[in-house]
Regions:
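Core segments of cupin and vicinal oxygen chelate
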Residues: 3-44, 93
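Vicinal oxygen chelate
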Residues: 6-9, 62-109
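Active-site beta-strand termini and strand-to-loop segments that position acidic
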Residues: 37-42, 102-105, 115
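Conserved beta-strand in the GNAT
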Residues: 45-47, 101, 111-113
């Protein structure tokens, strides 16, 4: 899993639900709420933190693999008030990869990725 501290707990969970994650488990750790979110084999641990940086740093990005990058881009731009990067291509792996990046409510970068 990938841990994500937040002082915007509800907003963060809602954001990840909207891009396909489902709540896997919820816990209380002392005075902090913890929510585990799952998308296929990827687990995010979202936990309350009163002194969060609100910028990239806790992680640089997470990548979500998709089968159709153009459909994912269309969904994100039509359903969410976000300004993603344009779909880009890199010559990684055997045939390359296409991707775009959005920014979550804590400044985290979320990459949508399609292997070609």
């Amino acid at each position: 899993h990938v841990g994500l501290p937040t002082d915007r707990y509800e907003e963060t969970i809602s954001f990840y639900h909207r891009i396909g994650f489902e709540t896997y488990d919820t816990e209380i750790n002392g005075a902090s709420r913890v929510c585990f979110l799952r998308l296929n084999d990827l687990i995010l641990e979202v936990y309350e933190c009163s002194a969060c940086t609100q910028q990239t740093g806790a992680w640089d990005h997470i990548a979500i693999n998709v089968c159709d990058i153009d459909a994912a881009f269309e969904y994100v731009t039509s359903e969410m008030p976000l300004q993603p990067t344009c779909v880009q291509k890199l010559p990684f792996f055997e045939r390359g990869v296409r991707f775009f990046v959005i920014t979550g409510p804590n400044g985290e970068r979320v990459e949508f990725n399609q292997y070609l």
